[in-house]
Amino acid sequence: MYSLARPFLFSLDAERAHGLGLSALDLAYRTGTTPLLAARIAPMPSTVFGLTFPNPVGLAAGLDKNGEHIDALFALGFGFVEIGTITPRPQAGNPQPRLFRLPAHNAIINRMGFNNAGVDALVRNVERARNRRGMLGINIGKNKDTPNEQAADDYIACLDKVYPLADYITVNISSPNTAGLRELQEETSLRQLVSQLRERQESLAARYGRRVPMLVKVAPDLSERDIDAAARVLGELQVDGVIATNTTIDHSKVAGDPLANEAGGLSGAPVLEQSTLVLRRLRARLPESMPLIGVGGILSGADAVAKMAAGAALVQCYSGLIFRGPSLVSECVEAIRRRREAPSRGAVAPL
């Protein structure tokens, strides 16, 4: 069915199509017609971060920034859904247009800029969700006008409010669309920020009697030296996991496209190779006990298997969902299942 709707959606402005697509998913969920869009997925339990995921394929942050579509998204068969990025205060993000499709490359460029309704609105939306069929991740960030020296205050403000509701929390320090944000990945800044967040995480765990895993999401544009430094810091501070990766600022693989020079982060097929390379390097440098989520360029089951082979315990997609539709979810799960059941065909770590 998505193949029929896609030409219409792609004829619209990308951000308008985004909103209409989510509204259509909500309608399908309310009317019980989601099975027309997405195949039923047999369980494939995967225990990671001490949590049991119904299957290892999730939705990356960015599609549902405010947690308004949680039930409808879980109905597509995702083993986990990550909402956000959310900030302490509402913000409009960057001026439109700010979202661009590059169909010839199965790619998207976005410069959204953490547009969201604020953490309090997200909390209300999560509390209204009634059918969480998998694990819910909440991705947190800082407001655009908060200087990096005070970034920890923003992350802690979000952490405090979403902690009771999240199954895991992602610290987003890698979006290219908030000026200066990626500087928080530099070794000294990273250590200062994550140490404060780890301290608050332990305090919240004691308060609520429940330890919610905290992950850090990194960029695909890190040098080998940066990867080494990040792995050293995150390993020493014992974060629960790492998500590799966010979008890239390198548009060389879409050179020649009419939209290639639009500012923003590039996602989709062109980022697969580099994001998987960063994933593999992190896996080699981080403690074996620290799981990784692989995201970036997954447009097929084979791409998902490649992420697992590179060291991911779980995978996420977003751009692939735009180009392939909901059938991508079941395709990825089944590809991972086949490889898991036939380990002699390739090295995918046990889930």
From Swiss-Prot:
Binds 1 FMN per subunit. GO terms for cellular component: cytoplasm; plasma membrane. Substrate binds at K65, N110, R111, M112, G113, F114, N172, N177, N246, T247. Keywords: Cell membrane, Flavoprotein, FMN, Membrane, Oxidoreductase, Pyrimidine biosynthesis. Its main location: membrane. Belongs to the dihydroorotate dehydrogenase family. Type 2 subfamily. Catalyzes the conversion of dihydroorotate to orotate with quinone as electron acceptor. This is Dihydroorotate dehydrogenase (quinone). It comes from Stenotrophomonas maltophilia (strain R551-3). The gene is pyrD.
